[in-house]
A protein has these predicted regions:
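Core segments of transmembrane alpha-helices
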Residues: 107-111, 192, 217-228
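Alpha-helical transmembrane segments of multi-pass integral membrane proteins
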Residues: 26-33, 64-71, 106, 216-220
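Membrane-embedded helical hairpins/re-entrant loop segments and their flanking transmembrane helices
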Residues: 38-62
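A short amphipathic helical element positioned immediately N-terminal to and/or at the very start
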Residues: 9-17, 85, 192-204
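Transmembrane helix-loop-helix hairpins in multi-pass inner-membrane proteins
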Residues: 1-13, 64-177
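Membrane-interface helix starts
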Residues: 17-26, 201-216
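Short helix-coil transition sites and intra-membrane helix breaks within transmembrane domains
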Residues: 32-39, 44-46, 68-79
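Short, membrane-interfacial amphipathic segments enriched in basic
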Residues: 176-196
Length: 229
């Protein structure tokens, strides 16, 4: 996907034109970015009683970025991470909470950085982005909206039950699911939400780890900005 439609000679010429130290630094920062997410997953998973070690959690991060890169709209990353975490003996509910908190931290950092630039460097942004400044505001708004929705799902797991029941009724009407299995499916959702809520409460008892996850996410996000420099 990276090299589709590109000429290998031009790519190689661009790579050779780079300074060795700059190229090595960019590669190191790229690896740091991915490994940092694995570290954050380990910190949160440990608080939720997960079994996976640091290297295994880093492998979840690499797996997530890989499948995000090859699936439409980057939708395949977290499902594959959840699958691997479950296969390694971690509970689905705890793993789901960990991945959602990781996503919230990532989005929240983007919102904070975007809002900071808008407040203190708004004129520079307008001059630099020109006609694309509206897209910047749209992106900031969408990231904020997603952050609020996911945070709501973490704090108010009842939303999951309401949403799952709504989708269940919709799929039954579309004849994608059998109506006879609705009771069983709803019971599974309720059991999942109970475990999910216990994992959320457990994380709330470890505010230090949540703060560490946010700070590490801030460092991780800014390391990506340094790569382009």
């Amino acid at each position: 996907f990276c090299f589709s439609g590109q000429k290998p000679q031009e790519i190689w010429a661009a790579v050779k034109s780079m300074r060795g130290m700059s190229l090595a630094g960019a590669v190191a920062l790229g690896l740091f970015f991915v490994c940092m997410e694995g570290t954050i997953i380990r910190i949160l998973l440990g608080a939720a009683g997960g079994k996976s070690g640091l290297l295994t959690c880093i492998s979840y991060s690499f797996l997530g970025f890989f499948y995000s890169g090859i699936t439409p709209s980057a939708t395949g990353g977290q499902p594959m991470q959840l699958y691997e975490m479950k296969r390694d003996g971690n509970s689905v509910s705890s793993s789901t909470v960990v991945l959602m908190v990781t996503a919230v931290c990532y989005k929240l950092v983007l919102v904070c950085i975007g809002a900071f630039l808008l407040i203190f460097q708004g004129e520079m942004l307008r001059q630099y982005l020109g006609g694309y400044f509206g897209l910047y505001l749209l992106g900031l708004f969408l990231n904020l909206a997603i952050t609020l929705v996911v945070t709501g799902m973490i704090v108010l797991p009842q939303w999951i039950i309401v949403g799952a029941n709504a989708f269940d009724r919709l799929f039954v009407k579309l004849h994608l699911w059998k109506a006879s299995g609705s009771v069983g499916r709803q019971e599974k959702v309720r059991c999942f939400v109970q475990e999910y809520h216990r994992a959320v409460l457990f994380l709330k008892e470890h505010p230090g780890r949540l703060a560490a996850a946010f700070l590490l996410t801030f460092v991780q996000r800014n390391s990506a900005f340094v790569i382009t420099w």
